[in-house]
Amino acid sequence: MATPLLLVVNAILIMAITACGGGGGNGGIQLIMVNNCGESVWPGLLGTAGHPTPQSGGFHLGAGEEAALEVPAGWSGRVWPRRGCSFDSRGRGSCATGDCGGVLRCNGAAGATPATVVEMTLGTSASAMHFYDVSLVDGFNAPVSMAAVGGGVGCGTAACGADVNVCCPSALEVRDREGRVAGCRSACRAMGGDRYCCTGDYASPSACRPTIFSHLFKAICPRAYSYAYDDATSLNRCHAKRYLITFCPPQPS
């Protein structure tokens, strides 16, 4: 987790970017990614619904580092943390969680589950509202949050700030080579079936209700999607030019 000094440095960086008007030009939206984890994270990125994938789909973000990128207005996509990665000079390797085919730059490939996912559909000049959330529908592998920089109109924070791995049921655990819990699968990913995945006869909000596992995820991370139809308390709406995505966000004291 972050040290007090690191949090101060991050705050100064964000204020400087905001004051100087960096990013968000030409109608684009700036995404600032901050790694407050005590180890490296390799963010994975994927444009959805035909939208481009920025940064060729992935990059390395060391402990305490920040990166800023711009996506166009109307962009739709997802961001997720990859952890426990090792890549050679050609960008080939693997990650313990969130892997996208054994490459550094995912280039249009989605991440393997379990992974905590930030999802967003950004507005345009014709429809300015942005929608975003943090989802555990694909499971959990790291705490993540997304919030507008400097606030905004009707903005909230999407987050799963707790370490779900600590209390992951054994049936959902994914362990690394050292035997440590590296991720927590969703019930859909672990057990399958229409009831857990909200598919087939359960493919509607009225038919697909939260399971005991969804209730557990929601109790730990009340501001994140715990299952497919968890919109009421998980989907955020905002109109801002810059957003901060934080891996391992600081916990309230």
Swiss-Prot record:
> What domain of life does the UniProt record list for this protein's source?
Eukaryota
Q: Which InterPro entries match?
A: Osmotin/thaumatin-like_sf, Thaumatin, Thaumatin_CS
Q: Which of UniProt's keywords are assigned here?
A: Disulfide bond, Signal
Provide an example Pfam family for this protein.
Thaumatin
| BP GO terms, sorted | defense response
Q: List the disulfide bonds.
A: C37-C248, C85-C95, C100-C106, C155-C238, C160-C221, C168-C184, C188-C197, C198-C208
Q: Where are the transmembrane segments?
A: none
| Gene3D superfamilies in UniProt | Thaumatin
Where does the record locate the signal sequence feature?
Answer: 1-19
* Cross-referenced SUPFAM superfamilies: Osmotin, thaumatin-like protein
The record's similarity note reads: Belongs to the thaumatin family.
Q: This chain belongs to which protein, by name?
A: Thaumatin-like protein
